[in-house]
Structures are given as structure tokens and as C-alpha cells.
Amino acid sequence: MLRKIRMILAGVFFVLITLLFLDFTGTLHHWLSWLAKIQFLPAVMALNVVVVVALLLLTLVFGRIYCSIICPLGVFQDVLARFRRKKNKYSYSKKVKWLRYPVLAVFIIAAVAGIGSLFQLLAPYSAYGRIATMIFQPVWKFGNNVLAEIAERADSYAFYSVDTWMRSLPVFIIAAVTLVVLFVLAWRGGRTYCNTICPVGTILSFFARFSWLKIYFDEDNCKNCSMCSKNCKAACIDYKNHKVDYSRCVVCGNCIDSCKFGALKYSSRASKSRESSEASPVDTSKRSFLLASAMVAGAAMAQKKEKLMDGGLAELEDKVAPARQTPLTPPGSLSFQHFAQHCTGCQLCVSECPNEVLRPSSDLMHLMLPVMSYEHGHCRPECTRCSEVCPAGAIMTVDKEEKSSIQIGHAIWIKKNCVPITDEVECGNCARHCPAGAIEMVPLDENDEESPMIPAINEAACIGCGACEYVCPSRPFSAIYVEGHEVHKKI
């Protein structure tokens, strides 16, 4: 019963949070963004005391069910482990302290020292976010585009095509390597990653030792058949000595389900004898129901591209991102420092951005940190999706009115790239598309009536949305680009 309830809850959580990363329509984040905000590390970074305390209390009562049900990377390992069809494939192994605790120490040092790349690399939720965003979402979009093409031939527009492109090759490689490592570890040893590398698993293991409900042996009923140990994906059951390493147990229920002699119980205390066990039988179904109720209640509480516009003025070739002195971060991130200190690199904002403005940074100093660039779209003033889904408080929630008054950067004009000068043609795309009215066209030479019109930028009114940079027909470098601000301003 415990195993079935765990599998149902884990399946629901995993499917929903995966859909949250895959969704490019903007419809699911209103309903599912709370799933990201109940993840342990994002809640810590957001100083969400309610969620952190709730998860710790959940661990103190039920054990490490966070790792077994809520964490998408943990459930994903269970999915990968199923590719190894061999039954009774696990065995007991001692905890790997020499690796487990040093990894946690490095993780904490990276968090305190602000070494974002290392912190994001080890964070479990962020690791799954990278895999979902960099690998799963492009495949999902490709499938959608195939359906859109088929539907269009049938005069149906139930689907629409979306662009797929490589947001960051280094981050894609990191995601692919992570996926391969997870597959090998899960295929060979189940939850090896959770109990040797994952810092969240190590933190929760300290509390799981003292959980109220645990897996206990009834030594009178145990036949030492080893089936429990062979089905324990955490490799934490020493059947010979009738002991369970509760710091590694993820309360999956596999051991109870595989035991034919009723020698394992999920209860608040160990059975002392056969007589006491028979006199007071342990009703695991009630505890399983309690577990399910707690998870459902906790979930309920947590919930309270346009085409290139070249105008025929330039060849259709890909734009090259300018070398910005200060990276652009989304409105609501307050400053680059605040964003870098709080971001866990889960890439949820990247996957949710409807205009594909956000992408993981390829800069070694800020690798995997989402930054903005305008080769594929601009940041629409009315869109606040990234601030709504950010689980770590790196992007504070802003409404449409507030966003329109936040200056994340300002536009800079590059004379040598501007087509009215280089090609002697009229343009004005940047001025026509500026939502803030911060650009007007003025003659290059006021004394010449035939002088080409060039953009004049009012930096005080510019909000840094990038509409001008995106629609600029100059290739490969735009004649106008947005330079970021270290600290965002209100205008």
C-alpha cells in the first residue's frame, strides 16, 4: 500500500513539474508554478521559511519522502532505473561518507562564497531543470512542430509552430553529461546519486535519522531471504543484522512490498516480539493514507517569435549578440548581484520565456546563470511570466505596470552599423517599435535636407526591453543594442 501511494504521488508530481518546464504556451505556469516553489533549495534561496520548515517537519515525521515524491531528479532516477529490467537488482552497501560530506561542504562553501556555477551544478532541482529545458523541451517543440505541419495540411490550426534553437552549447553539454551520469548511476545502483552526491539528500538525511515513522524489522518473522535488500534502491537495508540506514532510506516502500513474511513495518517503533506484533498489528494502510493526506494538504497550501523584421534591407542571417559590459537580467531581479546570489540555475525562467529572450550564460564566470539577449525576441513590457515562476526569489514578482517603469539597461547606437548610413536607405525600425517612446529619428546633419535620419535615444526614458535591438535590420551586429545596468532603476 505504501509503495502504491508513493508511486502515484511521485508520478503526479513528476509529470506536472515536467510539463511546467515543457510548456511554451504560457498556460500552465499559472497553475503549476507552486511546484517549483516547494523545492528545497529554491525555498532556501528565497528565504521561504514556511516551505523550508514544512519540508523539514515532513522529513521528521515521514522520513525522506521529499526525495521519493517531490524532488523531480529523485523520481527521474526511478524512471531511469526501470530501464534495467532485472529483478532483485540491488544489494546493501555502506554509506560513502568520504564523498557525501565533502560534497556537502563544497556546496555550502560555494553558496556562501557566491560561486554560482558550482552551486547550480550540484543543486538537484536545477540539474533536472537543465535536462528538461535543454534536452526535453527542444524534443517536445519538435514534436509540436510536426503536429502543426500535419494539422496545417488538414486546414487545422490546433497547433502552431515554434522556433527551436541551441540556447547555450556549454549548458547543453552539462545537461547531457548529467543525464548520462544519472542514467549510469540509477541503472547500476538506484539512488546512488541521492545518497553520495546530492547535497539536499545529505541535509535531509540528518533529520531523517530522527523521523517518527520508519521502516522496522520484525525479527521473529524475518527469514533472512534478502528480498528486502535486493529491492532497496537506496541500498540501505542490512538484512543480516536487521538494520536500516535511515539517513539513506527514501521511504519508497519497495522492501515492504517485496517481503512475503510481513517482517517489515512502516511504524513509529520497532516490534519487540511476535506476540506484541500479533496483539497490536500495525496498520500500514492508515499510515499510507496519512502520508497521502499530508502530501495533498501540503500541495494545496503551496498553491494558496516573431519572424526577423529585416524589411528587405539586409540579408537574412543570424544576429550575433553584442559584447555587453554588464549582463542583462530580468525586471524584478533588482540587480545583477542580487540575481546571481539567489538564482539556483534551474532554467525554469528560460523555458517559460515566450519570446526566447532568456538563455543560460556561456560565460565561464556566470555559467548556467540565465541572462537576456535579443537576437530572437524582445522583452515585452506586458509579460511578467519569469517573475511569476521563479522559485528562488532571484526574480521578484512584478506586475505589468511596475515592469514598465523598471530600467534594466539603456540602448546604445552604433553609427558604423546603421543601414541609413551604410546602405543609404530609410529605416526607423527602432523608433517605430520602441514601446517606451525613447527613440526618435533625427537628421544626421541638421543643415542638410537630404541627410539620412538616424535614431536619437532618450536614455532616461529607455527601459532596456530590447525591441530596438531585435528589429534592427543590421546584420550580423545590430546598429543599436542594450547595455545592462548593475542595479535596476525606477523611471
Which ranges hold each PLM region?
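Non-ligating segments of multi-cofactor redox enzymes
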Residues: 1-242, 247-248, 253-491
